[in-house]
Regions:
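Mid-to-C-terminal Rossmann-like scaffold of FAD/NAD(P)H-dependent oxidoreductases
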Residues: 172-285, 316-320, 324-350, 357
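Rhodanese-like catalytic fold shared by cysteine-dependent sulfurtransferases
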Residues: 305-316, 320-357, 365-396, 402-452
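A Rossmann-like FAD-binding core segment of flavoenzymes
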Residues: 60-157, 447-452
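Short hydrophobic core segments
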Residues: 1-9, 44, 122-132, 196, ...
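Rossmann-like dinucleotide-binding cores of NAD(P)H-dependent redox enzymes
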Residues: 48-106, 187-192, 209-235, 434, ...
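Glycine-rich dinucleotide-binding loop and its adjacent helix/turn
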Residues: 8-62, 95, 149, 155-157, ...
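Residue-level detector of alpha-helix initiation sites
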Residues: 10-12, 32, 48, 80, ...
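FAD-site-proximal beta/loop scaffold in flavoenzymes
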Residues: 23-38, 120-201, 293, 297
């Protein structure tokens, strides 16, 4: 049985009408676009399908509005990582309506309006629903197959169902998550194809086993690549795991070779065991390569510190001598050995500004003048040793720079002089992305609404 997952339909009110489609009947939507040439489109949902559709519609000159019930797009990402995606789409001219739940749809002549909670109606020539999928289990129910808590078909490692001689694979089966061990639904083509091979082997008398998946995924959104594997922070917290996180912004290849592009990486590992729990990467080049290495290391059971020793291919056009994956291992080892302590963007607002701690920004004056975190005083790294006598002893020192490297070096200088210091994870670039996204959400107005 190779049941699929079915796109969720619209909430009422919302009769099936000409102006909207779900990705499950994409040929209908494609012919609608070709026939009617819509000028505006509203997309409900913020996952893979919605974003890929949004990109293609925008390329055709359609004005796109994306509605998402939660504060971010791309649920496999944490909010802080998703902010880079939000900024990219806004720069492409798309309208993001986050924290906006669709309550229904209303047909008005040739226009369809998305009705959002709170009463607002958003008119468009085309509406596309991509608000998630549910397992297609109707046949499984008729056949008396056992279903799991998520509505998927229960199978063992041989892909056998609860009924002898019936095998099931694909989107509608519940499989073990390789990180948590809990059964889950992973609607991706990679796992489905591997399950099919296992089932076929066993049907033909073999003894193959499918152990599970960790949800490795990648998607192209305009010029940006977004990838994830394993757990994000939300999932790790829900699983009750104690974890540490590492954020870095390396170049896709050696900095002295032209054309390198920044990527932002976030890696989670379990405290104590150092077990890799998950990774997220957003960038332009080399994203898929790094997520695949991290996914392989996770499935192989490597501890996070083992990443520093991976012998990865290097040439200036493709990588750095210390690959971004190696850097994750170096940074984790520094944390585990107590070489450095860190703080995160969500900690910044709670830092006292009463003089009981010292807040330093180790960037250049030019970088600092372009924006800084409140209360952080500019002492460039190259001048830090000249100003050590001006930094109050006995007070914790929190240090920030653009990416996290110079602030780390500043922390090493300070620690060697007896200071208790903390390095900002991800750098000001990461912090600024989160703050800009929050500011935009608080100050943005729907199209056609005048600012007061």
């Amino acid at each position: 049985m190779t049941s699929f997952s079915w796109p969720r339909g619209p909430p009422p009110p919302g009769p099936r009408c000409l102006g909207w489609t779900v990705p499950g009947c994409f040929p209908c939507g494609q012919s609608f676009v070709e026939r009617n040439r819509p000028k505006t489109a509203v997309l409900a949902g913020g996952g893979f399908i919605s974003l890929e559709m949004a990109e293609n519609l925008a390329e055709m000159g359609v004005e796109v509005t994306i509605l998402q019930r939660i504060p971010q797009l791309m649920n496999p990402l944490d909010y802080d990582m998703a902010t880079f995606l939000h900024s990219h789409l806004r720069r492409k001219g798309m309208h993001l309506r986050l924290n906006t739940a669709v309550a229904g749809f209303r047909q008005e002549g040739e226009t369809i309006s998305a009705l959002v909670e709170g009463g607002e109606a958003i008119p468009a020539d085309l509406a596309i629903l991509a608000i998630g999928v549910t397992p297609e289990n109707a046949l499984a129910k008729q056949a008396g197959l056992a279903l799991g808590s998520r509505g998927g078909i229960v199978v063992n490692q041989r892909m056998e169902t609860s009924v002898p001689d019936i095998y099931a694979v694909g989107d509608a089966v519940e499989i073990p998550h390789l990180v948590t061990g809990e059964n889950t639904l992973i609607s991706l083509a990679g796992p489905a194809n591997k399950q099919g091979r296992v089932a076929a082997d066993n049907i033909c008398g073999g003894d193959s086993r499918y152990l599970g998946a960790q949800g490795s995924s990648v998607v192209k959104v305009c010029e940006l690549t977004v990838a994830a594997t394993g757990l994000n922070e939300k999932a790790a917290q829900a699983a009750g795991l104690s974890y540490e996180k590492i954020v870095l912004s390396p170049l896709s290849h050696a900095g002295y070779y032209p054309g390198g592009k920044l990527m932002t990486m976030k890696v989670l590992y379990e405290k104590g065991s150092q077990r890799l729990l998950g990774a997220q990467i957003v960038g332009h080049e080399g994203v898929d390569k790094r997520i695949d290495v991290l996914a392989t290391a996770m499935q192989a059971g490597l501890p996070v510190t083992a990443l520093k020793d991976l012998d990865l291919a290097y040439a200036p056009p493709y990588a750095s001598a210390k690959d971004p994956v190696n850097l994750v291992g170096f940074m984790a080892e520094n944390l585990e050995q107590g070489v450095v302590k860190q703080f995160h963007w969500e900690d910044v607002a709670g830092l006292p500004r009463d003089g009981s701690v010292t807040l330093l920004d180790a960037r250049t004056p030019g970088e600092y003048s372009g924006g800084c975190a409140e209360g952080f005083v500019n002492v460039p790294l190259d001048e830090l040793r000249d100003h050590l006598g001006e930094i109050a002893p006995g007070k914790p020192v929190y240090v920030m720079c653009q990416s996290g490297l110079r602030s780390y070096l500043a922390c090493r200088i300070l620690a060697q002089d007896g200071y208790d210091c903390y390095n900002f994870s991800g750098g000001y670039r990461f912090y600024e992305s989160v703050l800009l996204d929050r500011w935009t959400r608080q100050n943005a107005y729907p199209c056609g609404v005048e600012r007061p």
